[in-house]
Curated annotation (Swiss-Prot):
Record lineage: Bacteria, Pseudomonadati, Pseudomonadota, Betaproteobacteria, Burkholderiales
Protein name: Probable chorismate pyruvate-lyase
Pathway note: Cofactor biosynthesis; ubiquinone biosynthesis
Described purpose of this protein according to its UniProt entry: Removes the pyruvyl group from chorismate, with concomitant aromatization of the ring, to provide 4-hydroxybenzoate (4HB) for the ubiquinone pathway.
Gene label: ubiC
Species, as recorded: Burkholderia cenocepacia (strain HI2424)
Catalytic activities: chorismate = 4-hydroxybenzoate + pyruvate
Domain of life: Bacteria
Length: 198
């Protein structure tokens, strides 16, 4: 399964200028939270669950109208108390009451409990981009820094999951603390106290 995010600046190959760590994490398959769990204890903090309109660069990927109501879930993934990822997940409202209804009951459990344990779920290719001020994801990521100064740009990735033909898109924005950890410690196994995905 594929979707074309190029018109909105998303691309399958990370842009030139990304570090090796960034290229690695933007293209890793599987559950992002499972990868984070290799770095330390993972905590999922839900910051918003609501009915909303899609962002400007989301309708095409979801094959939906720009005004179609969506169910939105936003979380911060922290490792040992430090925010590493801001995640934004979105599904058509009708699908969130149907094939994706379990996403409404997750609370602080990771979304990956739904995405990676069900053989009926298919995933698109990962796409990525730099995120600068003016994109709603930049505001979401900046807020996750708890007052720390935001960088000029973040890097983020997204993919679309489908179950019975109904889409759920997950966008994951990596925060500066993740890159600092990798610079200092690499990403080898440490305590694994959590599993799952954004």
């Amino acid at each position: 399964m594929r979707f074309d995010g190029a018109q909105a600046g998303w691309r399958e190959t990370p842009r030139p200028g990304c570090t090796l760590d960034q290229r690695d994490w933007l293209t890793r398959g599987g559950s992002l939270t499972a990868h984070l769990a290799r770095l330390g204890r993972v905590n999922v903090r839900v910051t918003r669950e609501a009915v909303d309109r899609p962002w400007f660069d989301e309708p095409d990927a979801l094959a939906s109208s720009p005004r179609a109501p969506m169910w939105v879930r936003e979380v911060i993934l922290s490792v040992d108390g430090m925010p590493y990822v801001a995640a934004h997940s979105i599904a058509p409202l009708a699908a969130s009451k149907g094939v994706w209804q379990a996403m409404r009951r997750l609370r602080t459990r990771p979304l990956a409990e739904l995405l990676y344990s069900d053989p009926q779920v298919e995933r698109s290719a990962l796409v990525s981009r730099r995120v600068i001020a003016g994109h709603p994801l930049y505001a979401l990521a900046s807020h996750a820094l708890l007052g720390a100064r935001a960088p000029h740009a973040f890097v983020a990735r997204r993919s679309v999951f489908q179950r019975h033909g109904k889409p759920l898109m997950v966008t994951e924005c990596m925060l500066p603390a993740l890159w600092r950890h990798l610079d200092a410690h690499g990403d080898g196994p440490r305590s694994v106290g959590s599993h799952g995905g954004a």
